[in-house]
Amino acid sequence: MNPIDQFREQTRSWLEANCPPSQRKAIPEGELVWGASDVEFHNADAQLWFERMRDKGWFCPDWPVEYGGAGLSAEYNAVLESELRRLKCRPPQINLGIWMLGPVLLEFGSEEQKKNLLTPMTRGEVRWCQGFSEPNAGSDLASLKTSARDAGDHFVVDGSKIWTSYGDKSDWMYALVRTDAKASKHAGISLIVLDMKSPGVSVAPIDLISGKSAFCQVFFDGVKVPKSQLIGPLHGGWNLAKRLLQHERKAMSKFGEFSLPTHFHLLPLVKQYLPEPVGQSESALVARAVASAMNEHSYNLTVQRMGEEARAGQDVNGLMSIMKLVHTEQERDKFEVLMDVMGYHALGWDKGAFTPQEQAITRGWLNSFALTISGGASEIQLNVIAKRVLGLPDVK
């Protein structure tokens, strides 16, 4: 048996023995495990799965061992991902730091930063949020105004960030700040990390139409940030931001691989609400559902293939924008089909004769509209595709 096949056999046996059966099914609303200083578990099995994967180094299996990873090569990491999918294992934790900031730190961070920031990520001990968008700097991110004034051994940060996911629950933030107000808007930006408990940081949740408040506005009033928390070169944050956004779009485009609350299996739901389609209209709904499910399956296979290409060293950065755009449209299409199939059952809210699943689907439909903006607006993705994939010139 060659080493890869041997590793696959060992991995399969370990997962069969260590992933509790309850952690091999879709995650209900409220059971996500977020890596954090005050991590919460819905049940003992979730904690057991978290601890076993953490101790194995499989939160970040392809990260170096010295930072808490398992040091797996791309080929071995692909085997692990394949076996996790085969068994339908839940993600042991959700951690934006691992998905987005971590790869940037591995590439651009100092050795001290890697030791201080990466290790807590690989142990699920810190919850991260992203400080990019501002009230007047969304799609045009380089127009940001939040300033970081040089004060000797530290920066003094003033301004605000908006649409910060889970800012009220996060331990740390990675943020873009303006460190040179006189430079061109792309040239005077730096990337820093800061403790959300620092004096001068305040957070205000934003109420959403879905009834939830995942987004926040964060205010900075004279916040002191040590210069050791500057990531990469001073005034060089824009290039790091572009790299980080590539990882963000990759993470968002991979959501379909995970059994997250909004990842509803379409065809079983169609069978549930239309057990025996009657007439042309219901038959047409079934046909739409089958087409949507096939598109979703094709998308997931493409994401897996792109992951293999990326691990083999191929440049897939431009393709990430394509996948993010496709994912957005597929989610909207899927929930539109569900709304039509479920009829009045799709009107579920907090109260009334609706199941938790029906209420979650209604919220998923509302959230699907926001996907056209979050993680990079669809219009921005089209511009990236035009330039980086199709090679079209700028139009002045």
Regions from the PLM with identified roles:
Residues 146-149:
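A structural signal for short hydrophobic beta-strand segments in well-ordered beta-sheet cores
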Residues 93-112, 138:
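N-terminal glycine-rich flavin-associated loop
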Residues 154, 158-204:
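A short core secondary-structure module
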Residues 1-95, 116-123, 267-279, 285-288, ...:
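Amphipathic, small/basic residue-rich leader segments at the start of a protein or domain
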Residues 201-301, 371:
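Glycine-rich beta->alpha junctions and the first turn(s) of the following alpha-helix
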